[in-house]
Amino acid sequence: MDRFPEIFHKVVGELPAAGRLPPDQEFPFSTLRPVRDGFVQRSGVKSWYGVYGEKGPWIAFAPIFQIAHTQMLKATVPYLAEHFRVFTMDLRGNGRSDRPRGQEHYAFDEYYGDFLAALDATGVDCCALIGISATAMTALRFAAEHPERTSHVIVAGGYAHARVDDPRIAERVRAEGERMRTDWPKYLEWFFSMLFPEAHSTKPFEDGVRYGWASSGELVDWGRNGWLKSDVTELAKRVKCPTLVIHGDADKRVPIERGRAIQSLVPGARMLTVGGGGHLQPARDPVMFNRAVRDFVSGTPRGGTWVRAMSRRRRALFISSPIGMGHVQRDLAIAGELRKLQPDLDIDWFTVDPAARYLEQEGERLHPITRRLANESRHFEHVAGEHDLHAFFALRTMDEIMVRNFMTFSDLMDEEHYDLVIGDEAWDVDYYYHENPELKRQPFVFLTDFVGCLPMEAHDGREAHLCADRNADDIEHVARFPYVRDLALFVGNPEDVTDAPFGPGLPRIREWTDRNFAYTGYTLPFDPAAFSDTEKLRSRLGYKAKEKIAIAAVGGTAVGGKLLGKIAEAFPRMKKEVPELRMVLVAGPRLSADSLPKMEGLEVRPYVHNLFEHLACCDLALVQGGLSTTMELVATRRPFLSFPLARHFEQNVHVRKRLANYGADRSLAYAGLTPEALAQRALEAIHAPVCYKPVETDGAARAARRIAQVLDNRWWAKS
């Protein structure tokens, strides 16, 4: 990447082959596939289109300028498709569409013709049109020429003409074209830096560069030339349908005066100014954009039931992270203690598999709207390697999931009344509440067992830069809007927090956490005293008294499948040394038991409900490096070895520090570990004495008391 700008090294990272989409990108969105898609062909050029959603009025996005493609709409289309039928297409020159060579293939009339042909092919009879930037001209032209097929027009960052009669504009256009063709990477840096002036925009900037990289400077120059000299000013005056103009007053690409000009041209048009906003609201301010589009196109108040205030039951919504099983088990323990303090409080749950499955088995109520949630565990499994999960980049690339799930949460808050929202590592709700604090309607309690993203690779300057940027964003959010979190709970003790800095020029994590969180102590989902009679527990669970029980488990995702395979390879040697050994491999809720090795004497089980009971009476546990399982083993004083996922900052830094505080860091690196070495270490561990520090047992009760105080809201009253 030596020819690339420095910001590519710091923010964008390694790029795929230029001029085409990455080979693994079959469709634009990771959380939603089109209900149908295809191509239209005009003059030998094929253009791709997709349709999302199966009910409701039509929304059609006019195809985006060739420097991007449909994936730019990943924060908006998956949500809008819950309420509308949504049409998108890739403009010739990028995405899944053809990339013809030669200026003759690139003209506004060609773009407009492709759009009409694709709308006809999909049977879109009447639609709300959305035109972003240059494609505002497409939307305005269509609305003027086909009023019978247009219900609404929304333009974002748009303009009504691209005339170049001013010599200064002509020279700027010429210089831009030369830069596109001679130094495409540098042009992409300049262009997307201008589009996203908002602080902490590293992810949309990176995405923009990648979208542009799927085309080329030459193609985009031809494509841009096709827009030049276009003018729909007179056509805009003929638009009769409701029109909304959205424009940022800090837009450096298309000054807000261009948006105001559209408002003045279209009779009755409304203007939504985004204070401090740049050029691309669908990418940078998707919550605002999605809600504005939904409300404008719907036109009427949403249905549902409004309950008079004093007729409402007291209700809490508990958002539980579905990554692994530890969150939901501790959350259920907290909920149980909260019910003791607030017996009239109804609790609904907001999560997905595998946490949702656990709650259903426990008889809890999942809100029906959770069927709309995108699955975070599936994303983590998709980006993981062999016992390797770059946790920070897994979080960073989860942006489509986060905004979609927040929008589902936002819909629920619009439709129903809750007295309290509790979010256990609900990063989506926490982030978008801070970005849109006006949406918060009730007290919000935030829980986490770690604070701060930390780089794992010493020589990776990009990871360090982006971790610090994310941390700074969080710090600034909390400082500016302290009222978003009515209570922030750290599941643990002060000494469990690392003293490392958040990044260059940022505070130390421990000092900041002390000022911004209350500590609950560790929160167990059970009382270890209930499992003190291990012989009785073994008998109840079907284990024989003279057996040596080894249990291998990898938590609530499928990421640890390779670890279970390696443990299975070590089993024969262990069995030879300890003939009475009985080993159980637990596949977990998202890993098929059929995928695990089969051999004599090795027991393979699918998901085991409340696995902590089995772990509490085992002679050895071999587990992944997650916090919950390892701390449960510490609490029940069981020998164990843990194998943290490579490059997983939480498991390798935060969890290991906490385990060390309890005298229980039993971590081994998976990489390079042979079955023989694993067997040897396991045999040593099974005979080693356990000297752990006792784990506190009142964490759930302490958390519940704090939460109840938020519900009571009398902390400020004088006694």
Regions from the PLM with identified roles:
Residues 140, 144-145, 150-179, 642:
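Flexible "cap/lid" loop of the alpha/beta hydrolase fold
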